Curated annotation (Swiss-Prot):
GO biological process, one term: hydrogen peroxide catabolic process
Organism field: Chelidonichthys kumu (Bluefin gurnard)
Protein name: Hemoglobin subunit beta
Extra remark beyond the main annotation: Displays a strong alkaline Bohr effect, and at low pH exhibits the reduced ligand affinity and cooperativity that comprise the Root effect.
Stretches assigned to the Globin domain: 2-146
Keyword Transport: yes
Gene that specifies this protein: hbb
GO cellular component: blood microparticle; haptoglobin-hemoglobin complex; hemoglobin complex
Binding locations of heme b: 63, 92
Length: 146
């Protein structure tokens, strides 16, 4: 993947300003509320039987933060994202049996949450760079499935 200077700077800027403890939980809770079939991966997280329960579930919130911190690895290794996520791809494919399309659903929800936080600063150019980054990460996470 070729990255322009603007794309690199944009991705690094977004993640350097991101409040992981807010954006991560908001992203994962949005994902499991909008796409309820994704809840099957989180059954061990306790009460997730309603929107209110999901919004108040500390394990969902914690895992959302963990997911977001996992994206840091991609930000720090933008020139080698595929290898950066090879182990996680294998884990999600072989052990957790996560449908790889769910990575895209999560990235779509992350885009919505980030856009809401950034407001007018989330221009078309910024969104294009952000979604390009997420697309490369999603493809890398799904790599083990092929």
């Amino acid at each position: 993947v070729e990255w322009t200077d603007f794309e690199r700077a944009t991705i690094q800027d977004i993640f350097s300003k991101m409040d992981y403890e807010t954006v991560g939980p908001a992203t994962l809770t949005r994902t499991v509320i909008v796409y309820p079939w994704t809840l099957r991966y989180f059954a061990k997280f306790g009460n997730i039987c309603s929107t209110a329960a999901i919004l108040g579930n500390k394990e969902i919130a914690k895992h959302g933060t963990t997911i977001l911190h996992g994206l840091d690895r991609g930000v720090k290794n933008m020139d080698d994202i595929k290898n950066t996520y090879a182990e996680l791809s294998k884990l999600h494919s072989e052990k957790l049996h996560v449908d790889p399309d769910n990575f895209r659903l999560l990235s779509d929800c992350l885009t919505i949450v980030v856009a809401a936080k950034m407001g007018k600063d989330f221009t078309g150019e910024v969104q294009a760079a952000f979604q390009k980054f997420l697309s490369v990460v999603v493809n890398s996470l799904g790599r083990q499935y092929h």
